[in-house]
Amino acid sequence: MGGKLYKKLMIFICMVPVLISCNKVSDSNISNKDIISYCTGDIDSDGTYELIAVNDGGERKKLPTKEAYGKFVEIYKEFTIDDGKIILGSEPDYSFDFSNMKPSKVQLGDVDGDGKLDISIVMYKKVKFHNALAKRPFFYNFKYGKLVPLWLGSRLSRPFDDFKLADIDNDKVSEIISIEELEDKNRVLAVYKWNGFGFDLFIQSHEEFKKLMFDSTVTEIKLIADGKEREVKFIDGKILIE
């Protein structure tokens, strides 16, 4: 393949830290130690960043997967970042009680392509069409001081360990990049695109792994696969893990 064509087809999967910053609290420093996951971004399109967070209310509880989960989803309009430390206002501007859904992770991305950030919250609950406790990828918009559901899907194609939002194909729309469990307990990387009503499986990796996780030390989509650091590339409609 010629070098010029290769450059057009090869895309490193990456986040956009200028627009969005998301962290687990173990990876950062934040003034409220009850917060277990947070993102900063302009969720109401007013030209200024907000911080949206999952707060555990000081209870320090964990899911069967050993992941911490919270009770409240909070939005702060006032916060400062000083030498890497995030200092929040004394009280959130908005607080939503999701204690019956056990939220564990919040992310931001424009999944439906309307130019506005959507809010992704991982919940742990039963749903109508899947009567078992499992992690669910719920999506919301923030409008008029409320979290308005965009998509409360029952599940992805398979149970997932974790997922991130990123634009893998440079179409200015965020895709779901998911680490999923197969029937034989191996893991694969799967990508989903918004179809107007929900998410369709777009592509998945051919390679399978016994253990697969995101490298939390970088903003790019990099993996730890069976103990080795691996890069993810999107080439000519395929995912390669190198």
Question: What does each of the following model-derived ranges do?
Answer:
Residues 1-4:
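Short, Lys/Arg-enriched N-terminal segments with co-localized hydrophobic residues
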Residues 22-242:
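Beta-propeller-forming repeat regions
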Residues 6-13:
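Sec-dependent signal peptide recognition
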Residues 14-21:
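Hydrophobic h-region of N-terminal signal peptides that target proteins for export
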